C-alpha cells in the first residue's frame, strides 16, 4: 500500500482523530450486528497501547443533516464500545461547537471520546456549503486516521476534507489496510481463475460502472435479484410484474453484447419463486423463466434449478465475489436463494470467497457462515467502487507512504 500507515505515526501523548464506520443496524435502541465496531478495535487498541487520546468520528443512518435526531444518535454504540474497551467512553452531545471542544480538551492520553453523529450537520455531506465544519473537526487533533472503509467512497467532510488538513499526518487504520490489501490483491491484481462475480440488488443503472469494469476481469458474471429481471426482459423474456428498471434495459443489452465480445459467460436465473404479493410469503410457486412469469405475478427469489446452476458455477470457480442478495431475503421463503449462495460459498473452502458488504454480508450472517468466508467486507458501495475504479476518494487523499 502506497499510503501512510497507522504504524508510521508517533501518537504517544497526542490526540488522534479516527474516522470509524459505526453505521450499524439498530432496532429499539439495540445493536443487531456489531461487526463494524469489532472491526475497528485493532486500530483503537493499537492507539491506546501507545497512550494516544482517541477522538472517534462516525455517522449513523441518513438524518436530515441540520439538527439532532434521537433515532440516529450514536448513544446505543457507547455500551458496546465500553464492553470491548473495558472502560467508560464519554459521548459528546455534538461533534462541533463549544461542548465538543471542551470534551476534546478534557480528553486524557489513553482514553477514548466518541463524538455525536457527524451527519447531524449539513457540512458533513455537503462540505462545499460549510467548509468550516471540516476545519473545526481537524482542529481537535495532531493526527488523522481513516479506518472507515465502508464510507470512503464518499467525498464527505470527515473522510475527504479533514485529512487534507493533516499533511504527512493522515494515515490508514488497520481495517482500511486489510480491506484494500485483500480486495486489491485477490480481486484486482492476481485473482485466481476462474473468477466469478455474483451481483444482485435492484437496479442495473446503479451498478453499470462496476459491471462493465468486471467484464474485463472476470470469467463468469452471475446476475440475479431485481436486476436480473431487467436483463431477462432485455432478452425478451416474459417477467410479469417483476421489478424491472425500464431505463436499464438498454444498459443490460449493452452489457450482454460486451460480455459476448469479451468472452465472459453471463448466468441469469432459469426459474424463479413467484407470488402475487411478497409481504406474506404465501401462495408462492416456482416457474420456469423460459415458460415465462404471467402478468399479476412477480419473481421474489431464484428457484431451485437456478440455485443448482449458480452453485455449480461457484464450485467450478477459484475466486468468487458476491454483492447484493438474489431475492427478498427478509421474507421467507424468498430468503432461500440468497442463503443457498452463502452456504455454497462457505462450503467451497479451496476458493477465495469475498462478500462485498451490505445485504450480502447480512445474509451470510443469517446463514451462520461468516467465519467460513475468506473475506467479508465492511463496505458494500465502497467495495463496488473500489472494484470499478481501483481506488476510493477517502484513501487517495491520505498522506503518501514514507520512503
From Swiss-Prot:
EC number(s) stated in the UniProt entry for this protein: 2.7.2.3
GO MF annotations, alphabetized: ADP binding; ATP binding; phosphoglycerate kinase activity
GO biological process: gluconeogenesis; glycolytic process
Pathway terms, separated by semicolons: Carbohydrate degradation; glycolysis; pyruvate from D-glyceraldehyde 3-phosphate: step 2/5
GO cellular component terms, A-Z: cytosol
Family to which the UniProt record says this protein belongs: Belongs to the phosphoglycerate kinase family.
InterPro entries: Phosphoglycerate_kinase, Phosphoglycerate_kinase_CS, Phosphoglycerate_kinase_N, Phosphoglycerate_kinase_sf
UniProt main location, coarse: cytoplasm
CDD domains: Phosphoglycerate_kinase
Name of this protein: Phosphoglycerate kinase
Pfam families the record matches: PGK (PF00162)
Record localization: Cytoplasm
Annotated signal sequence range: none
Binding site for substrate: 21-23, 36, 59-62, 119, 154
Keywords noted in UniProt: ATP-binding, Cytoplasm, Glycolysis, Kinase, Nucleotide-binding, Transferase
Reactions this protein catalyses: (2R)-3-phosphoglycerate + ATP = (2R)-3-phospho-glyceroyl phosphate + ADP
Subunit structure: Monomer.
Residues binding ATP, per UniProt: 207, 299, 330, 357-360
Keyword match Cytoplasm: yes
Amino acid at each position: 500500500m502506497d499510503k501512510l500507515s497507522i504504524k508510521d505515526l508517533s501518537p504517544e501523548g497526542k490526540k488522534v482523530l479516527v474516522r470509524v464506520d459505526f453505521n450499524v443496524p439498530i432496532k429499539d435502541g439495540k445493536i443487531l450486528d456489531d461487526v463494524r465496531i469489532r472491526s475497528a478495535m485493532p486500530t483503537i487498541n493499537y492507539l491506546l497501547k501507545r497512550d494516544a487520546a482517541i477522538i472517534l468520528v462516525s455517522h449513523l443512518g441518513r438524518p436530515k443533516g441540520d439538527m439532532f435526531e434521537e433515532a440516529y444518535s450514536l448513544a446505543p454504540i457507547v455500551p458496546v464500545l465500553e464492553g470491548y474497551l473495558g472502560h467508560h467512553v464519554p459521548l459528546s452531545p455534538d461533534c462541533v461547537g463549544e461542548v465538543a471542544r471542551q470534551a476534546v480538551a478534557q480528553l486524557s492520553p489513553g482514553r477514548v471520546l466518541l463524538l455525536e453523529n457527524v451527519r447531524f450537520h449539513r457540512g458533513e455531506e455537503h462540505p462545499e456549503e460549510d467548509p468550516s465544519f471540516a476545519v473545526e473537526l481537524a482542529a481537535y487533533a495532531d493526527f488523522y486516521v481513516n479506518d472507515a472503509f465502508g464510507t470512503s467512497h464518499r467525498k464527505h467532510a470527515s473522510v475527504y476534507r479533514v485529512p487534507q488538513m493533516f499533511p504527512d499526518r493522515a494515515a490508514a487504520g488497520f481495517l482500511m489496510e486489510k480491506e484494500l490489501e485483500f480486495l486489491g490483491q485477490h480481486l484486482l491484481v492476481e485473482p485466481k481463475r476462474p473468477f466469478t462475480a455474483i451481483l444482485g440488488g435492484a437496479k442495473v443503472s446503479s451498478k453499470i460502472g462496476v459491471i462493465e469494469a468486471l467484464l474485463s476481469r472476470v470469467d463468469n458474471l452471475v446476475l440475479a435479484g431485481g436486476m436480473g429481471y431487467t436483463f431477462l426482459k432485455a432478452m425478451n423474456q416474459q417477467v410479469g410484474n417483476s421489478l424491472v428498471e425500464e431505463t436499464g434495459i438498454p444498459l443490460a443489452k449493452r452489457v450482454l453484447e460486451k460480455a459476448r465480445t469479451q468472452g465472459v459467460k453471463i448466468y441469469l436465473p432459469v426459474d424463479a419463486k413467484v407470488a402475487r404479493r411478497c409481504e406474506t410469503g404465501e401462495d408462492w410457486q416456482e416457474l420456469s423463466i423460459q415458460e415465462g412469469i404471467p402478468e399479476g405475478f412477480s419473481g421474489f427469489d431464484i428457484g431451485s434449478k437456478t440455485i443448482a446452476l449458480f452453485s455449480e458455477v461457484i464450485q467450478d470457480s477459484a475466486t468468487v465475489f458476491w454483492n447484493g442478495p438474489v431475492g427478498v431475503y427478509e421474507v421467507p421463503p424468498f430468503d432461500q436463494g440468497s442463503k443457498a449462495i452463502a452456504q455454497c460459498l462457505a462450503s467451497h473452502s479451496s476458493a477465495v470467497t469475498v462478500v462485498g458488504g451490505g445485504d450480502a454480508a447480512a445474509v451470510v450472517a443469517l446463514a451462520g457462515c461468516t467465519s467460513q468466508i475468506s473475506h467479508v467486507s465492511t463496505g458494500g458501495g465502497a467495495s463496488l467502487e473500489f472494484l470499478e475504479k481501483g481506488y476510493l476518494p477517502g484513501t487517495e487523499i491520505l498522506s503518501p507512504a514514507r520512503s
